[in-house]
């Protein structure tokens, strides 16, 4: 989804949220019961001989997980580990699951975020609805630790470390479960995870946070010169098919661009005509969109890469948690 219903974010909850509270209570109860079943062993988890780090959320839509997953994978590699990344592959339409993701994979087959991670980290990446089966492909590739991009609610996947990413601006919305609010699980689920990390400072929610730092613009065309992108002050068409497009538009405005926003649904399968806006103004899109649009976008098109940068105390705690993975067992 590109934008959430406004009443999901309104505190205190308004009449629409209250009207849906019975359904939200039912949904939340089912999620609690399902998790309890896994904890008690009534529903069997998969088994993996290596530690698993789950990076997920309880808020629907984008919270900035994928850049943090890339940072975690890079950090593990710098520690001498052999990380692999597993993902559901949202948006992918492959007929064969699970499957490995290569740098030249078709995003329509494997999904945009897994392809972005494969290209950005150089780590083995595997996708599939059954993340345990996908993780087995990573073991065959020699990985000694698995990082799951999303999957907090995929309880069949065992985990040694659970990290939840929240949006520092939207927080937990109105604090209610679907369909009355934006939460995939009740808010008290956060008390059971190893670390809650906010994308942007949110002291009322957690002391741990990171920021997304934009890099220099890069052209979509492979044969284009890396320099020559639009200067700040230029009016640009901004394209974002992510969970929270407004955040991308605000980033461009913060860099000095005059933005004509074009929000699309998350994981949107673009067609060429959707990226032509009837003028010769430059187009800037997210890196996640760029992996799908290299052959579709107009000539004057760029993407804005971002990387996660944990603040010092958060970085220290994350590194300490990752360093002791060898002593942790999956649960």
From Swiss-Prot:
GO-annotated molecular function: ATP binding; tetraacyldisaccharide 4'-kinase activity
Name of protein: Tetraacyldisaccharide 4'-kinase
Coiled coil: none
Catalytic reaction annotation: a lipid A disaccharide + ATP = a lipid IVA + ADP + H(+)
Signal peptide stretch: none
Gene: lpxK
Main function: Transfers the gamma-phosphate of ATP to the 4'-position of a tetraacyldisaccharide 1-phosphate intermediate (termed DS-1-P) to form tetraacyldisaccharide 1,4'-bis-phosphate (lipid IVA).
Annotated residues for binding of ATP: 59-66
Family: Belongs to the LpxK family.
Pathway(s) this gene product operates in, as recorded in its UniProt entry: Glycolipid biosynthesis; lipid IV(A) biosynthesis; lipid IV(A) from (3R)-3-hydroxytetradecanoyl-[acyl-carrier-protein] and UDP-N-acetyl-alpha-D-glucosamine: step 6/6
Keywords: ATP-binding, Kinase, Lipid A biosynthesis, Lipid biosynthesis, Lipid metabolism, Nucleotide-binding, Transferase
Kinase in keyword set: yes
């Amino acid at each position: 989804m590109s934008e959430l219903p406004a009443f999901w974010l309104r505190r205190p909850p308004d009449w629409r949220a209250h009207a849906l509270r019975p359904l939200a209570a039912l949904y939340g109860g089912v999620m609690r019961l399902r998790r309890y079943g896994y904890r008690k062993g009534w529903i069997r988890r998969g088994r993996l001989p290596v530690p698993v780090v789950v990076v997920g959320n309880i808020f629907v839509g984008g919270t900035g997980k994928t850049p943090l997953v890339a940072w975690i994978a890079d950090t593990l590699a710098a520690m001498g580990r052999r990380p692999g990344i597993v993902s559901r592959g949202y948006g992918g339409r492959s007929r064969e699951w699970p499957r490995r993701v290569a740098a030249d994979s078709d995003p329509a087959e494997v999904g945009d975020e897994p392809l972005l991670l494969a290209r950005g980290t150089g780590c083995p990446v595997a996708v599939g609805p059954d993340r345990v089966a996908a993780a087995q492909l990573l073991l065959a590739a020699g990985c000694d630790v698995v990082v799951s991009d999303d999957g907090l609610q995929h309880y069949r996947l065992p985990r040694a470390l659970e990290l939840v990413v929240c949006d520092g601006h939207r927080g937990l919305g109105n604090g209610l479960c679907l369909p009355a609010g934006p939460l995939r699980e009740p808010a008290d689920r956060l008390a059971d995870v190893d670390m809650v990390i906010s994308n942007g400072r949110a002291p009322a929610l957690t002391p741990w946070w990171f920021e997304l730092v934009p890099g220099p613009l890069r052209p979509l065309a492979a044969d284009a010169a890396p320099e020559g992108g639009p200067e700040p002050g230029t009016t640009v068409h901004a394209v974002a098919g992510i969970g929270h497009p407004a955040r991308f538009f605000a980033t461009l405005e913060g860099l000095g661009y005059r933005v004509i926003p074009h929000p699309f649904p998350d994981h949107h399968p673009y067609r060429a005509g959707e990226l032509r806006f009837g003028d010769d103004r430059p187009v800037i899109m997210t890196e996640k969109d760029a992996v799908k649009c290299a052959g579709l976008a107009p000539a004057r098109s760029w993407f804005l890469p971002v990387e996660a940068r944990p603040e010092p105390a958060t970085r220290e705690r994350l590194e300490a948690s990752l360093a002791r993975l060898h002593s942790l067992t999956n649960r």
